[in-house]
A protein has these predicted regions:
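Extended catalytic cores of very large enzyme megasubunits
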Residues: 1-727
Length: 727
């Protein structure tokens, strides 16, 4: 029996065209059992399915369909559900939010700040709407806060730690003790209490806040329920940084960027190793001049000419910023936004009118961090269909996959949130999202190399081109219909209000790696490329990758005393590793496919493909990153303006300058390679490989919880590109 189990485990559940599947799965979705063994893919399928069946009261037929589609890698529940679904932790109402990819919150009170820290600590992406009509409901700042730290993290022995925060108020002496608790809620209460002190009328304009972190467990200690390890490394500086922001606003209300900084300072505390684990979206009114330039000149030069980040605004990098237009933007507004995004990746705009039209309600234009969900004070749970695993000729398999995804998201509508604003939103406007990934791969298989060549030509409206577009539309509209019918049928049978929009496309950067799909609707970087994934040095998963034959190099951040990149991953100065994975898309060897230059696809061609998805499949919004070169800025701006002006369905999209110069940006997450280079790398991997069983290789090195346990708040591979520093 044991031998049979080992044989099952040794057989890879992931396709050969997905070399990143093993490292991503074991780093991101595999939990450690109490007995010490780490979950294999089938274990995760068992756990998450059990949780869905229990929560969603699924029929046997629904259970069997969801199970088959997940095990066949055709339809998967959300990344958050893959991590926490079916655990005892996930069944407690205070932890329900941990099962959701993302949220949006209107910032109207101090509690909103605490809620967003709580959400970030559970792995949720946090959207915050920071328009005047919301933040002007916050009280005027009246008290100057002086912070004194008492006690070091980890001082109290485990058996004597407080779990809940304790607040001792001495109003007569204008003094408050904030004893942070060793729990998520304990962190949140200590943070929210400090903010509330700034407007507390029990004090006469000045208050001393004594913050005690003695009861907080030290870095590296296991988080038993959620999984992973504690990392309070940035918590001690949070309170003074927040006090500085609040003290700067005495006598007035906070402006939008001060609110943003308070949220982002808390988000910055949610880290694993030195890697960001939170993701955010901050929405500002289009007329908010303070917000418009908030990220400009973040880099500053010191007297020696060295560039550094402005420390008072560093936390702004934790989130994407979007300007919300409630009236259609002018052509000049759009051009300026496209120019700014090309230069810095920032400056995105959102047309709220289309969001409210789709959502069928005023104020329902709040966005999650990657911009694919629209609503107000919402939670969203996303399932994902892997189209690269499904034959374009097999309509039944397509329908089954989209039905399974719809059932998986509908099941979570049974959650009753503790927080009233989120529960009210769910009752009035329930939110689900069924996304897909690998649509580009699917189209290549459906329409052949001729479709690829037509894409390379710019997707012109020739007779053949119009035929291709009609076929794309037919697939997209049918899938949309299947999803909505399935969700609505489930809701009707369970007496749940029907969501009025159920389809979206997320960035799909992480789960796509499990099957080797080109993320979301996007084209791949190339037919063949090196995919580099960051790990801390000596990470057990990275060590297993070495045993499996993959090469490891130092990261871009590891340099010698002269500023040169290190070459030896075992150099004592090296702190992070890049595992290098040779990748070939599964259609790369179709006759003629190699000759198509994917990196030359125009911005307008990408935008045209994206709008096909936005018009014919997506009911929420389509997360999009259109890559462009400088000469494409004006034509793309004109096209976006037209799409808004003509009510074509456009809401928002991200734009990214193409990174063509590998020398300027060495060791990129994606580096195109030739077929010969790919085959040479693959041969070298096989020669170095000492085991065919990745799970067994990991068990040899895996002595405890991984630092980076569970998916991060953002699922986009676009966030991996290097930040442009001033030259």
């Amino acid at each position: 029996m044991v031998q049979e189990l080992e044989r099952t485990r040794a057989k890879s559940p992931f396709p050969e065209t997905a070399p990143a599947a093993y490292p991503v799965f074991y780093r991101t979705y595999s939990r450690r059992h109490e007995g010490g063994r780490r979950e294999a893919w089938q274990d995760v399928c068992d756990r998450t399915l059990k949780g869905l069946v229990e929560l969603g009261k699924l029929t046997n037929a629904e259970r069997d369909l969801v199970s088959k589609m997940q095990r066949d890698l055709k339809a998967m529940p959300s990344g958050r559900w893959l991590w926490v679904g079916g655990t005892e932790w996930s069944k407690s109402p205070k932890n329900f939010s941990g099962a959701y990819n993302c949220t949006s919150t209107n910032v109207v009170d101090w509690k909103a700040f605490g809620l967003m820290m709580d959400l970030a600590m559970m792995g949720c992406g946090t959207g915050a709407v920071l328009e005047p009509k919301y933040i002007n409901q916050l009280p005027t700042i009246r008290n100057k806060i002086t912070v004194k730290m008492r006690g070091m993290v980890g001082m109290t022995i485990e058996s004597q730690r407080r779990e809940e925060a304790e607040i001792k108020v001495d109003a007569a002496n204008n003094r408050v003790e904030i004893i942070a608790g060793d729990s998520r809620q304990g962190w949140v209460k200590s943070y929210q209490t400090l903010l509330e002190l700034s407007t507390d009328e029990r004090f006469d304009g000045e208050v001393e806040a004594i913050v005690d972190l003695s009861d907080i467990r030290p870095a590296g200690e296991r988080l038993k329920g959620f999984g992973g390890m504690a990392n309070p490394v940035k918590l001690p500086t949070l309170y003074q940084r927040c006090a500085d922001i609040l003290n700067n606003a005495i006598g007035r209300q906070l402006n939008s960027i001060e609110c943003c900084l308070l949220i982002d300072e808390a988000a910055a505390c949610v880290v694993a190793g030195n890697i960001r684990r939170s993701a955010g979206m901050r929405q500002f009114d289009s007329n908010d001049t303070v917000a418009t330039g908030a990220k400009e000149n973040l880099w500053q030069q010191d007297e020696a000419g060295n560039w550094r980040i402005d420390p008072t605004r560093d936390a702004l990098r934790m989130a994407n910023h979007t300007r919300v237009f409630h009236e259609k933007p002018s052509k000049e507004d759009v051009l300026t936004a496209v120019q700014k995004q090309f230069q810095s990746g920032e400056g995105a705009i959102q047309w709220a009118g289309e969001a409210e039209r789709r959502a069928q309600g005023k104020g329902r234009y709040g966005l999650n961090p990657c911009g694919e969900i629209i609503g107000q004070d919402f939670h969203c749970n996303l399932a994902e269909i892997h189209l690269n695993q499904i034959s374009p000729k097999d309509e039944q398999a397509q329908d089954d996959a989209f039905k399974a995804g719809a059932i998986a998201v509908a099941a979570l509508l049974n959650h009753q949130f503790v927080e009233a604003r989120y529960q009210n939103s769910r009752e009035e406007d329930p939110i689900v999202g069924v996304s897909f990934t690998g649509f580009f791969d699917f189209c290549v298989k459906a329409f052949g190399v001729e479709w690829l060549q037509w894409f390379e030509q710019g997707r012109p409206d020739t007779m053949k081109g119009l035929e291709f577009k009609a076929k794309e539309e037919a697939f997209l509209s049918r899938w949309k219909k299947v999803v909505h019918e399935t969700v609505w049928d489930y809701c009707d049978r369970h007496n749940i209000r029907r969501p009025n929009r159920c389809t979206t496309v997320q960035p799909a950067g992480t789960k796509s790696l499990l099957t080797g799909a080109s993320s979301g609707w996007h084209p791949p970087k190339a037919q063949r490329f090196i995919r580099r994934i960051t790990f801390r040095k000596d990470d057990p998963v990275a060590l297993a990758c070495i045993a499996y034959g993959y090469s490891v190099i130092p990261s871009q951040s590891d340099k010698d005393e002269n500023g040169n990149l290190l070459d030896d991953p075992f150099d004592p100065r090296c702190t992070e590793w890049l595992v290098e994975l040779p990748v070939e898309v599964d259609w790369a060897n179709l006759p003629g496919a190699d000759e198509v230059k994917i990196e030359k696809f125009t911005a307008l061609a990408q935008f045209d493909f994206y709008m096909q998805v936005q018009k014919h499949y997506t009911a929420h919004n389509t997360s999009a990153t259109v890559e462009l070169r400088e000469h494409e800025v004006e034509p793309l701006a004109n096209r976006i303006y037209e799409a808004i002006e003509n009510d074509e369905g456009y809401i928002s999209a991200a734009l990214l300058a193409r990174f063509d110069d590998v020398q300027t940006f060495p060791r990129l997450p994606f580096e195109p390679i030739t077929k010969t280079e790919y085959e040479d790398m693959l041969t070298a991997v096989r020669e170095r490989r000492t085991t065919e069983n990745f799970h067994a290789a990991l068990e040899k090195h895996d002595a405890g919880e991984l630092v980076e346990a569970g998916p991060a708040g953002c699922d986009s591979d676009k966030c991996l590109m290097p930040e442009k520093k001033p030259s």
